[in-house]
Amino acid sequence: MSKAKIGLGGGKNGATNDWNTTKYIWTKLAPHMPKDKVIWCPFYNKTAPMCEKYLTELGFNVIHKDEDFWENNHGDCVIDNPPYKISGIIKLKEKIMIRLMELEKPFMLLFPASTIQTAFFKRLYERGGFQLICPSEKYDYERFEGEKTRCMWYSVWICWNMNLPKDFIVI
């Protein structure tokens, strides 16, 4: 795997990836998140490391460190909004999901909804364990705390081995 660090904050590689999940989004997802597990949020963003703050406020035990995703493994599951592109890493979304599956780490990852229409997702889906949480609205993200943006795409939570009560949930 490329040594390119998924740490996100600023610079050439992070400039277009500094879009953070709002507290509103985390609040909508919270009823479907495990309260009894340690949640690893591995995709650190130095410009606004808000996921730990928001999830802690919602009562979750969270690990969110400025570390290389490819070289670390924390917690019981991963729930996060990963970067979609990083210069020098092709097929990033696929590589993230494969790494977590190889670690046998259950996950909930927020991706553009079009991700479920890709050939790589169809291949991974055949392995089993996938569930989807579909927002009933288009999410907006924030660059910094409180600074909302208009998103051009719809999003979906792609879940694997999270043992949700249903395979398709609309929130």
Predicted features, each with a name:
Residues M1-I171:
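Class I S-adenosyl-L-methionine-dependent methyltransferase catalytic core
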